[in-house]
């Protein structure tokens, strides 16, 4: 049975995308808190200071530290590697690279609320 009090870290450099994700997640009935980060570097800082993140939604193309770089850092860290990561992208070619780097799954943008809920259910056990 899936938890209904998830804490999700949403990582995207586009503020509008972050707001839409947050709205969809909070309306899903499964998420109690959405933490936002504008790049991979900020997200790593959040992950190092919190131990309650249940899921990461990660954009690939971002400044400072992109999604692939962040995936590599997270998967190399013994304390973080177990956190499920769903990659969000508009670039079909980035899916395979993200999965090879340790992403659990992916969603193509633009994201629909029903797809997001199904993806959450599939990666959170």
Model region roles, listed by residue range:
Residues 86-88:
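Hydrophobic/aromatic residues positioned on beta-strands within the core alpha/beta folds
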Residues 69, 91-105:
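Alpha4 helix (beta4-alpha4-beta5 surface) of REC/receiver domains from two-component response regulators
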Residues 62:
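Receiver (REC) domain active-site loop signature in two-component systems and cognate sites
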Residues 36-45, 67:
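Helix N-cap/capping motif at the beta->alpha junctions
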Residues 15-35:
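Two-component/phosphorelay signaling modules centered on CheY-like receiver
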Residues 59:
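Active-site residues of response regulator receiver
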Residues 111-122:
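C-terminal output helix
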Residues 45, 68-81:
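Short amphipathic alpha-helix used as the core "switch/output" element in two-component signaling
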